[in-house]
Amino acid sequence: KVCDLSIEPERIELYNWISENHSNLNILVNNAGIQNWMNVSDSDFYQKANDEITTNVLAPVHLATLFANLKSLTTIINVTSGLAFIPFSKVAVYSATKAFMRSFTLSLRHLLKSKNIEVIEMIPPALNTDLGGKGIHDGHPAVSDFVESIFEQLKEGKTELTFGTSEARANANNEAIADYFNKMNP
């Protein structure tokens, strides 16, 4: 089933289709996301920010709300980012959406405890993908290395899955956060 997650009726249609055709689905992975490198003075900043917020925040919140009602659901995995902890100013809105999703994930974990739905946060660092634009992340770790590490952490029962620089950011104290921020945002 193909769905544009930025369109609310399509999200509802996706949920209805899955509940009718795959009612035994037990895991929701909220991994949709867009990242725009932009400056607040760009003429299209607001529209791009709105698109990022819709796709990176409203869509996964809506999907979690819908799928939490699926009787077979046992796990929700929300994908955030190492930028949830320390923002990169060139992708300020993206960083903020991932910080929102981190906070939401922590609360959702608590809220869904009574329904026996486990909520896991997957926290990737920059990986060698085209997120944000072609070639921007060349030289970063391979997705396959990240996935291998994530599966090991899932086997260990972890609920916050980190890798590489995202692990350091997730565990950083205030001084380290300030140092990271200053290095990332000269």
Task: Indicate where each model-derived feature is located.
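Rossmann-fold cofactor-recognition segment
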Residues: 1-9
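Conserved mid-core segment of classical short-chain dehydrogenase/reductases
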Residues: 12, 33-50, 90
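Active-site helix of classical SDR
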Residues: 64, 97
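Active-site-adjacent segment of SDR/Rossmann-fold oxidoreductases
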Residues: 71, 86, 107-118
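Residue(s) in the substrate-gating loop at a strand-loop-helix junction
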Residues: 81
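Active-site loop immediately N-terminal to the catalytic Tyr-X3-Lys motif
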Residues: 88-92, 135
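C-terminal helical subdomain
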Residues: 121-122, 129, 133-175
